[in-house]
């Protein structure tokens, strides 16, 4: 089993790099160079290729092998990072990212989305039923670790680590990962998948997906359960930067510290569900408790933000406000990790109610909605903050975080 899990761990770690780069590192660097919250937030629109995974997933499934697609996409990611290394970084006073840089970041997300489909397909084919538990743990932990290394980890070394050196380092990492994907013995033993003789017609696919019991409720829940958390999580570090926190400190706490807490939360959620997995209601019961705690944590974070605007409030080293703000970042990530693990378990349970031939597509459909629910608030948070001000913006995030708590009362009986 170690011969399978070790290469998967390395590949999932590499898969988390683009997310950490664009969710943690770039926003703080761009804000430090004077870009508005609106423009910083809108750069997350570059995640758009991730929402189109269902468009090329059939191609990855039917043409070639997952190993070929995985190697090809990883090599392309290294090439894009190499091109980014030769371009000048965003300069202070610019109104936004240069068009060429935006285009390459869009290609980076396209390659990462193709890599995601290929790697998930490979994991499904590679792992035996008894290996799914350890395999899923490796997936979550390695992905979040890669995100932390590319986000907070690299940010800690700025400005020592220059823009060209950053992307040259990522280029070397991607090409090493591509060599790993091609040379790993366990991955080389996979055979070419057989193409199914029956392919659902596109016009009926959505109808078939929505006909699965519990899908409408699950789709609505996964679309909304992260909106408040994601909006606040993307905006709060930038506001701390505006109030005097250093970029390196935020990289350490918002990146590495928060990612460590998120991994711990995901691990705790998995352990709790594994201990009580015999009853399908357990994920919903866990969600009900943790979502209420998350709502309380966001209320405290909002109160901290309001207090920072009062005379005499400071984020200087050694102050209570500084410790409370950094603790708030980590606490929300920890609770968010538990919530994510429980929610993905609910998604899997719902997809298992679908016909076997539709289960993979059904799960991809729910995962795409889950991603959309995280991207929208992260992208629009800056626009809301610039237009409404941080106070009203965080009040809206509180309302959005309360909706999933109420939504759980409407869960259908086939999921409870």
Swiss-Prot record:
Localization terms from the record:
Membrane
Q: Carries keyword Membrane?
A: yes
Check the record and name the Gene3D superfamilies matching this protein.
MFS general substrate transporter like domains (1.20.1250.20)
Q: Name one GO molecular function term.
A: transmembrane transporter activity
Stored Pfam families: MFS_1 (PF07690)
The answer to keyword Protein biosynthesis applying to this record is no
InterPro entries in the cross-refs: AmpG_permease/AT-1 (IPR004752), MFS (IPR011701), MFS_trans_sf (IPR036259)
Instruction: Write down the superkingdom of origin.
Output: Eukaryota
Identify the main location.
membrane
Q: Where are the transmembrane segments?
A: 10-30, 40-60, 68-88, 99-119, 139-158, 170-190, 204-224, 252-272, 295-315, 324-344, 365-385, 392-412
Membrane protein topology class: Multi-pass membrane protein
Keywords of the record? Membrane, Transmembrane, Transmembrane helix, Transport
Q: Cite a GO CC annotation.
A: membrane
* Family, similarity comment: Belongs to the major facilitator superfamily.
- Specify the protein name: Major facilitator superfamily domain-containing protein 3
